[in-house]
Amino acid sequence: DLAAKLNALGEELRFVLLTSGANVADYAQAPADAWQSDLLKGLKVVLSKAEGEKCPRCWHYTSDVGKVAEHAEICGRCVSNVAGDGEQRKFA
């Protein structure tokens, strides 16, 4: 089913969708005002503004921008990519 395929991407779903975050929820639990796809049966979409600050390096909105003193202007993910071993991605 579609939800299982999307959930298989895990945290990388947000990269596939080019967004700061993404969640897959049960179709039946979608609010009445959710957008419903005419092309993909079983797909409803709800959009909301991302929380946190925009990282100037990756442009993702996240709550950990500035948490690392040595790299106070970027998010934790970017710190890992710039000063650490970097993130390991499987899909995107």
Curated annotation (Swiss-Prot):
Broad class of enzyme this protein falls into: ligase
Keywords associated with the record: Aminoacyl-tRNA synthetase, ATP-binding, Cytoplasm, Ligase, Metal-binding, Nucleotide-binding, Protein biosynthesis, Zinc
Recorded catalytic activity of this chain's protein: tRNA(Ile) + L-isoleucine + ATP = L-isoleucyl-tRNA(Ile) + AMP + diphosphate
EC number: 6.1.1.5
Cofactor binding notes: Binds 1 zinc ion per subunit.
Residues holding Zn(2+): C55, C58, C75, C78
Cell compartment(s), UniProt: Cytoplasm
UniProt xrefs under Pfam families: zf-FPG_IleRS
InterPro entries according to UniProt: tRNAsynth_Ia_anticodon-bd (IPR009080), Znf_FPG/IleRS (IPR010663)
GO cellular component, one term: cytoplasm
UniProt keyword Metal-binding present: yes
Cofactor needs: Zn(2+)
GO terms of molecular function: ATP binding; isoleucine-tRNA ligase activity; metal ion binding
GO biological process: tRNA aminoacylation for protein translation
Main subcellular localisation: cytoplasm
Gene3D superfamilies: 1.10.730.20
Top-level taxon in the UniProt lineage: Bacteria
Role of this protein: Catalyzes the attachment of isoleucine to tRNA(Ile). As IleRS can inadvertently accommodate and process structurally similar amino acids such as valine, to avoid such errors it has two additional distinct tRNA(Ile)-dependent editing activities. One activity is designated as 'pretransfer' editing and involves the hydrolysis of activated Val-AMP. The other activity is designated 'posttransfer' editing and involves deacylation of mischarged Val-tRNA(Ile).
Assembly behavior: Monomer.
This protein's domain notes: IleRS has two distinct active sites: one for aminoacylation and one for editing. The misactivated valine is translocated from the active site to the editing site, which sterically excludes the correctly activated isoleucine. The single editing site contains two valyl binding pockets, one specific for each substrate (Val-AMP or Val-tRNA(Ile)).
Family in the record: Belongs to the class-I aminoacyl-tRNA synthetase family. IleS type 1 subfamily.
Protein name listed in UniProt: Isoleucine--tRNA ligase
Gene: ileS
